[in-house]
């Protein structure tokens, strides 16, 4: 009887381990989907947006004219 239990026990443990991994994946997915509230009228946000836009424009310009 003990042999039978040892043979089925690893499979049961393995299935439980897979369920735990699945739950961990769902928690991680929920964290990624969490909505972040950013104040778009804040001066810091506007300053950051202008900096990002400027860098992007320079990148596009270099991409379009690589000789410069």
Swiss-Prot record:
Disordered, as annotated region: 1-45
IQ domain residues: 45-68
Modified residues (Phosphothreonine): 8
Biased composition (Basic and acidic residues): 18-31
Keyword Phosphoprotein: yes
Domain of life: Eukaryota
Polar residues: compositionally biased ranges: 1-16
Keywords: Phosphoprotein
Family: Belongs to the PCP4 family.
Protein name: Purkinje cell protein 4-like protein 1
Organism: Homo sapiens
């Amino acid at each position: 009887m003990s042999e039978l239990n040892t043979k089925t026990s690893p499979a049961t443990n393995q299935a439980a381990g897979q369920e735990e991994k699945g739950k961990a994946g769902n928690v991680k997915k929920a964290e990624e989907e969490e909505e972040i509230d950013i104040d778009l009228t804040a001066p810091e946000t506007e300053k950051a947006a202008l900096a990002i836009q400027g860098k992007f424009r320079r990148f596009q310009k270099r991409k379009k004219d690589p000789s410069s």
